[in-house]
Amino acid sequence: MPGPIPKPLKARELETWLSQNADLTLVDVREKQELAIAPFPHPVKHLPLSEAQNWMGTLNQLLPPAGPVVVLCHAGIRSWNFGCWLLEQQPAREVWNLEGGIDAWSVTVDPAVPRY
């Protein structure tokens, strides 16, 4: 039986939430070199999946205890996987996945963010 999955979120919807100062936590699961190429233009918690062994045990301290979490990566696949895992760990949490990742953000919201 499949577990819980993150809710899909389009880049324009996230832009609206951010412009309204929504109380949410942005989690970027891309690698450091990806952030250097195309940084997200808002503060994020950087939790690269390749370093999960370094932060997994302290996840409860790294994320606020409540409130929505929006997860992003390059194309929305790694973030979706992380979102599924997070919902298994914290079933009561509201988790959203940025559909199309930073690439969709660049195409539909902010072309100043480089595509790679």
Regions found by a protein language model. Name each.
Residues 1-25, 32-68, 77-116:
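Rhodanese-like catalytic fold shared by cysteine-dependent sulfurtransferases
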Residues 72:
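Short, surface-exposed ligand- or partner-binding patches at beta-edge/loop junctions that are enriched
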